[in-house]
Amino acid sequence: MAPKKAKKKVEGGSNVFSMFEQTQIQEFKEAFTIMDQNRDGFIDKADLRDTFAALGRLNVKNEELEDMVKEAPGPINFTVFLTMFGEKLKGTDPEETILNAFKIFDPEGKGHIKADYIKEMLMTQEGRFSQEEINQMFAAFPPDVSGNLDYKNLCYVITHGEEKD
């Protein structure tokens, strides 16, 4: 009788499921299910194209889709999908580090910075942001009616992936 073999580990060694809380894993599973348009258990170029189309972006180039798929070490099943997000998030600075960086521009400790000022800083200092990156940030985190950016909430979302209740 041959001994039973354990399931092969995904590249990277450690258990990717231990990197996330159960609620986060469920959210990733929902995202994976939405992206797996043909419901075959894998995300491929066709799934990505259909996902972009569903989001209103119809002019995605083949090369862009190929580059996205090439980021994975092989076929993208849910475990690989989760591992890829884990690797991307592993390099994310802790919330306190990001907050401290914003606090440099907020000496009075108000918790917000003028959006125009932060835009200027991000586009002119080392590690410059592009106009497109600035637009994406302000689309996701629009300034308030006074033109201020709530950087405390922004930091929370960057590090936790969701807004505070």
From Swiss-Prot:
The N-terminus is blocked. N,N,N-trimethylalanine, found in other myosin light chains would not have been detected in the N-terminal tryptic peptide in PubMed:7319048 because it would remain trimethylated and ninhydrin negative after hydrolysis. Ca(2+) binds at residues 36, 38, 40, 47. Disulfide bonds: none annotated. The keyword Calcium applies. The keyword Metal-binding applies. Residues 23-58, 93-128, 129-164 form the EF-hand domain. Gene3D superfamilies: EF-hand (1.10.238.10). The modification N,N,N-trimethylalanine is found at residue 2. One of its GO terms (cellular component) is mitochondrion. GO terms for molecular function: calcium ion binding. Keywords: Calcium, Metal-binding, Methylation, Motor protein, Muscle protein, Myosin, Repeat. Myosin is a hexamer of 2 heavy chains and 4 light chains. This chain binds calcium. This is Myosin regulatory light chain 2B, cardiac muscle isoform.
